[in-house]
Structure formats: structure tokens, C-alpha cells
Regions:
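Catalytic-face loop-and-helix region of soluble metabolic enzyme cores
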Residues: 336-396
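Glycine-rich, charged/polar anion/phosphate-binding loops
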Residues: 80-82, 302-305, 332, 361-363
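Long, contiguous, compositionally biased segments that the model treats as domain-scale units
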Residues: 14, 22-170
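Anionic group-transfer/hydrolysis microenvironments
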Residues: 99, 139-141, 321, 379-381, ...
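Single conserved hydrophobic/aromatic residue that forms the stacking wall/gate
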Residues: 1-12, 397-402
Length: 402
């Protein structure tokens, strides 16, 4: 079952102790508050793409503070998403994930959040009608403040500074102070993620996501002459809506939608500090988001990022590139979903249209032969970009995965 992940392709990046996979983590900069509730032992594993914080005591204070704060999401919500991801793995639902390549503190405004949410809801309405299938709506939002970098440092005019690793780590300005990793930024990221989730809940529970309202947005979209070709499709949805209303469908029941958050579990200290025990079941949940994924650079089956996620009950994803071997995929299933529970593991392909037909089939066959269920998600943005205004990467929707 192929589902869809959309994110913009802005060239925003992140840093770590060193680029690439497999470099052991510098334990001297990690905090010592490693409670026994975390059985996974990720600190003893190689951990790439981590910031080098200059003050270990300050890092320890920040993570202790984070551990004392309320969860951003709740176990019941996570379980609901897991059930919907299980339906998608069986072909009974379609997953739509959208949001920024990397969020910024500057754009953490009500208007930016509303517009991203609106776009995802509009797309979900069209997909639901076109496929006659429920759509699982996930925002790459409320926590996507970090992203891996290919180089640990950046040099300009003979000056070398740490790379910009996202707003939860350092600042984009090219000065020594701005580029020095600051653990207090994780607290800022936590607070901004909380306000984003609060606003999303208000929108999706308060009538803003009403199906009739979402359809009216799509009608406005087709008023643009550039999109006239979609007008007939909008008319079909319009007729279906009128039929539902005439047939007595309770539209009040369609005023609310389930909307979930996701981000890359990149900053190990932050994710570890956000793990909580569910009082109902005793299970561990990473309460920074409903769904977490590990990236192409950090997905080593025995490495720290995968090890951390083995210990939590959230649905998790793994980015899969064109150079991934079938044995790599099976090893990841062994680590992240050894008992084969539907809804637990998603494989997110990031291959580009040019390499997809060659690289993906062997991986699909390996998963099929293994027999344990996964939810397939395709990222049509990666590898299909063009350079738009101001050197920003963008993607034409008609050039995505075939």
C-alpha cells in the first residue's frame, strides 16, 4: 500500500558531532540522568548527527527540566494513530503526511500553522473522495525543528563554524555565538510544539475542519484559471456533498477530524527526555509526537536512534533510500517490529522518480517474503526537486514518483 508524504524542499539543515552514520556518541556531553525506565541502552550505541554542546551541566539541567514537563501528546492518541496505520498497512486507509522540511521558530505563527493545516485537509478531502478510502492525516509539524547535515561545519570567507542544524539546536546567523549549539533551544522547541498542537486541536475540534468548509476551500482553489482542469472534479465532490445532505447525513459529525503530529527523532537527548510511562498499560511512549521516524543517515539497526525507538510504543517510520539493501530492511523490521504488529512500522521511501522503479521492487519483495506487515509511505519530494526563486528547492507535483 503506497501512501504519500509531502514536505517542502527548503534547503534547511541540521548538525551533529560528525556527519555520516556509525560514529560513537561523545558521552562527555550527555547528561547523566539516564533513568532505569529506558531499557534500550541507546547511550552505549553509535549516535551520529548529534550536536556537541559546550556545557554538559547546562544540558543536564535542560533535559531534567523537560522530564518534569507535561507530555505533548497522550498515549490514547498514539494508540488511535497506530490502529489507523494498521488499517493503512492492510489497504483499508491512505496516509497523507505534510509539512515543512524543517520548521523554524520565526514561522511558528497562527497563520503559518493554519495554512499548513488547511492544505493537508484540502488534499485529504480530495483523496478521500477520489479513492473512496479513509485518509490518515499527519502533520510534519509541532516538532520538526532539527534535520541532519552532510557536514558538521560550514566555511565562509575563510571562517569555519558549526553547521546550522535547525532552530532547536542553533541559529542560522553565521556568527560564533549563533552557531554554538544551545540546549536551552530544546525548551523553546518544546514550548512552540505545545502551542502548535494546541492550535491544531482547536482548529480540528472546533469546526474549522468541517468537511463543508474544507470543500469550500477547494472550490476557491479551482477559481484560479491555472487550475481549471480540476473544476470538474470539484463539481463531482459538490454533487456528492449535496446528495449526502439530502439523504440526511449528520454533517455535525463531520465537524471534527483526527489529526496527528510527526517529526524525525533526531535529537536523542530531547526524545529521551520526552519518554513517559502510560499509567494504563505501563508502556513507554515518546510523548513529543504521535509518530516518530529515523532518517536515512541514522537508521543503522544497531545504532542509537533505532535503539531508542525500540523502547517506545509509538508507531515509527524509517527513511529508505535507493541504496538500501533488502537485508537492511529485514534487519530494521527485526529491531523495530520483531513480533509483526500491524501499524507499528512504516517504511518511507525517498528515492526520486528516476531510481524508484529499479530500487524499490527488491525491497518490496523482501518485505513480502518476510511476512511481517509494514505501511509503505512514499516521499515524492526527495530526489524530484527543481531550483525555484531565491535558490529554494521546489517540486512540481506532476514530476513525483510514478
Amino acid at each position: 500500500i503506497y501512501t504519500l508524504s509531502l514536505h517542502d524542499a527548503l534547503p534547511i539543515s541540521i548538525v551533529g558531532a560528525g556527519p555520516g552514520r556509525g560514529r560513537p556518541y561523545d558521552a562527555s556531553v550527555m547528561n547523566e540522568l539516564d533513568p532505569p525506565r529506558i531499557p534500550a541502552g541507546w547511550r552505549a550505541r553509535p549516535a551520529s548527527q548529534q550536536p556537541v554542546y559546550p556545557d554538559a551541566a547546562e544540558l543536564a539541567a535542560v533535559t531534567a527540566d523537560l522530564r518534569s514537563r507535561p507530555p505533548l501528546v497522550f498515549a490514547g492518541e498514539v494508540d488511535s494513530l497506530r490502529a489507523q496505520m494498521a488499517a493503512a498497512s492492510r489497504g483499508r486507509a491512505f496516509v497523507l503526511m505534510g509539512g515543512d522540511c524543517a520548521e523554524t521558530f520565526r514561522e511558528n505563527t497562527a497563520n503559518h500553522i493554519r495554512l499548513k493545516l488547511q492544505t493537508i485537509l484540502q488534499m485529504a478531502a480530495v483523496l478521500t473522495y477520489g479513492a473512496s478510502t479513509p485518509v490518515v492525516k499527519i502533520g510534519r509539524m509541532a516538532g520538526q525543528y532539527a534535520k541532519p547535515r552532510s557536514r558538521a561545519d560550514e566555511t565562509r570567507d575563510g571562517v569555519t563554524l558549526p553547521s546550522y542544524r535547525g532552530d532547536s539546536v542553533n541559529d542560522h546567523a553565521f556568527t560564533p555565538r549563533a552557531r554554538t549549539p544551545d540546549p536551552r533551544r530544546m525548551l523553546d522547541a518544546y514550548l512552540r510544539a505545545g502551542t502548535t498542537l494546541n492550535l491544531i486541536r482547536s482548529f480540528t475540534m472546533g469546526g474549522y475542519a468541517d468537511l463543508r468548509e474544507v470543500h469550500s476551500w477547494n472550490r476557491g482553489f479551482t477559481a484560479n484559471p491555472a487550475y481549471k482542469r480540476f473544476e470538474a472534479f470539484a463539481e463531482e465532490i459538490d454533487r456528492a456533498m449535496r446528495f449526502m445532505e439530502a439523504a440526511g447525513v449528520d454533517f455535525d459529525a463531520l465537524r471534527q477530524v483526527d489529526f496527528y503530529s510527526a517529526h524525525e527523532a533526531l535529537l536523542l537527548e530531547y526524545e529521551d527526555a520526552m519518554i513517559r510511562v502510560d499509567s494504563r498499560s505501563g508502556r513507554l511512549y515518546d510523548t513529543s509526537a504521535h509518530l516518530l521516524w529515523v532518517g536515512e543517515r541514522t537508521r543503522g539497526p544497531q545504532d542509537a536512534h533505532v535503539t531508542l525507538l525500540t523502547g517506545v510504543h509509538n508507531p515509527v517510520g524509517v527513511k529508505i533510500g535507493p541504496d538500501t539493501a533488502p537485508d537492511d530492511v529485514v534487519a530494521l523490521i527485526d529491531r523495530l517490529n520483531p513480533t509483526g504488529e500491524a501499524g507499528r512500522l512504516s517504511l518511507i521511501t525517498r528515492m526520486g522518480a528516476d531510481r524508484l522503479r529499479e530500487a524499490l521492487p527488491p525491497l518490496v519483495e523482501a518485505v513480502r517474503a518476510d511476512g511481517r506487515p509494514v505501511t509503505w509511505i512514499t516521499d515524492p519530494m526527495h530526489g524530484n526537486t527543481i531550483t525555484a526563486d531565491k535558490d529554494r528547492k521546489s517540486t512540481r507535483l506532476n514530476s513525483s514518483h510514478p
